[in-house]
Amino acid sequence: FTITTEVCDLFYKNKKKLPAKMIKDIEAELKNIEKKTKKKFGDLKNPLLVSVRSGARISMPGMMDTILNLGLNDKTVEALKKKTSNGRFAKDSYRRFIQMYSNVVLGVEGHLFEELIDNYKLTKGVLLDTDLDESDWDGLITNFKELVKKEKKINFPQDVKQQLLGAINAVFLSWDSQRAKTYRKLNQIPDHWGTAVNVQAMVFGNMGSDCSTGVAFTRNPSTGENSFFGEFLINAQGEDVVAGTRTPQYITKKAKQDAA
């Protein structure tokens, strides 16, 4: 479901808080997703996980915030592990969520999490995140939560409804961030437009070697040429494509040849 730009306007007029009626509407829309997916938000057997993304009228790549795997906590991650019979995937998804949520909503610097991962990989003697197994991510999840406690003096939130409202607030607030303001000024995008928020059931790109994530364009974004263009990563999630930590593959043969 989409929370419209009008709500963004109301959010700022309401001292940067969601109106009470809107919170009820969000809960009702969440129930619709639960019915369609046959999953329940916060459930300990078949948990619904969602993504929370900006929906600005004009694309502002890298300017607005995104949170994936929302709805995971210390209990639902075990339910996800049991449901999918894939412990590594479940723990990898949880650590990603802790990273994104802590950075976007709680304000913990993102590089602090990456440093923990890099140091762990050095200790273990591996190069890639994909070389880490379930027990590795388990240990890093503990380290991540300790980092949040140290930096923000709070425990990482376990209440899934609190997580969702925090993420929606953060996306609205990202419209007013300095980087977004600068981008709008450079690209003549009006400040009063605001952003929408899209809440969607998660589809996973990190469940194994038969899963992937990527971006695609109907035109080449560099040249404007009328040709399909895109790139993807196997066994990854969206942030990996834009973060530059792994080299993506090209979707088309022509792009592969041009890059060679």
Question: Predicted segments — roles?
Answer:
Residues 1-260:
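Nucleotide/phosphate-binding sheet-loop regions of phosphoryl- and nucleotidyl-transfer enzymes
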